[in-house]
A protein has these predicted regions:
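Short glycine/proline-centered loop/turn elements that form peptide/ligand docking sites
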Residues: 179-183
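Short, charged juxtamembrane terminal tails flanking transmembrane helices
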Residues: 281-285
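Short hydrophobic, aromatic-rich alpha-helical segments embedded in or entering the lipid bilayer
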Residues: 233-247
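Short coil/turn motifs that cap or connect alpha-helices
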Residues: 104, 193-194
Length: 285
């Protein structure tokens, strides 16, 4: 026979009053959490929703029909696609080494990537001038290759790479780290070389995470502004087009270009997120 000790009634509590059942408390906590999450979700989406209320298809069409209005879109797409290619070619090996390598100064590598992430973009632009500007040794070397890292498409790509690379490298590192190393070891036991095991095992399993990292980097590159305005004021991409239109003709004229930037930048991250979520669901199932 077991005995239960009844808690003493507290101030204002009738001696026979029962404590609130645990399920009720859990339901109240869940409802409060859901309400808080809904408030945060609405607050985060508020600016986007507001933009759709203030911009109509007619205003977007009218803005894009203006002479030269499509040039910033073409420049942004061209620079963004080249930036993604650079990130995949250079950032993926670095991310793999950070996740799998046994480098003696691995923490130093990670600290360098984090430092570039935490630097304000405007500061990045200023530092790039002193690193790759025309009067620097690197700038002079680039000049021999007929490349200029200021006010050119090449300069825009450099700025976008510096602003977006940390997002891709850290995201790709997390994607590689999430793959169980024992899968690679099993492939090696079956006779696969490390490079073949990476292609057949690691990359397919890490692909959703890599796609998500690349999509975030794409959005970051498309919206790059701080470093761009310092070293690549020309040719205009969409962010600078929004800025100059705002300065010259006002907020109402800049909003259509803001909507175009969202339409170009956001679909890839959304698609990558849905693919990643589906892949996680398949693994759990």
């Amino acid at each position: 026979m077991s005995w239960a000790v009844r808690p003493a009634p507290g101030p204002g509590r009738a001696p026979g009053a029962a404590l609130a059942p645990a399920p009720v408390l859990r339901s109240a906590s869940a409802a409060a959490s859901l309400a808080g999450a809904a408030v945060v979700w609405i607050a985060l989406l508020g600016p986007v929703i507001t933009l759709f209320f203030h911009v109509t298809p007619g205003t977007v069409s009218s803005a894009l029909r203006a002479p030269g209005a499509l040039t910033p879109l073409v420049v942004s797409l061209e620079a963004g696609l080249i930036t993604l290619a650079v990130l995949v070619c250079l950032g993926t090996p670095l991310a793999w080494l950070m996740a799998r390598g046994r480098l003696p100064a691995l923490r130093l590598w990670e600290a360098g990537v984090l430092a570039s992430l935490l630097l304000p973009p405007l500061v990045v632009g200023l530092l790039l001038i002193f690193m790759v500007g025309p009067l620097t040794p690197i700038g002079e070397a680039l000049g021999h290759l007929h490349l200029t890292a200021t006010n050119t498409l090449f300069a825009l790509i450099v700025a976008e790479v510096y602003e977006s690379a940390p997002y891709y490298v850290l995201g790709a590192q997390a994607a590689f780290a999430a793959v169980d190393p024992r899968m690679e070891q099993q492939a090696a036991l079956l006779g696969d070389r490390p490079s073949r095991a990476a292609r057949r095992v690691t990359l397919p399993l890490a692909a959703p995470g890599l796609a998500m990292a690349l999509a975030v980097a794409w959005a970051r590159a498309m919206g790059a502004f701080g470093a761009v305005i310092i070293i690549a004021y020309h040719p205009y991409g969409l962010p600078l087009q929004i800025w100059t239109t705002l300065q010259e003709t006002g907020l109402a004229s800049a909003l259509p270009f803001a909507l175009v930037l969202l339409v170009v930048a956001l679909p890839l991250p959304v698609a990558a997120y849905l693919w990643s979520a589906r892949a996680r669901g398949r693994r759990r199932g």
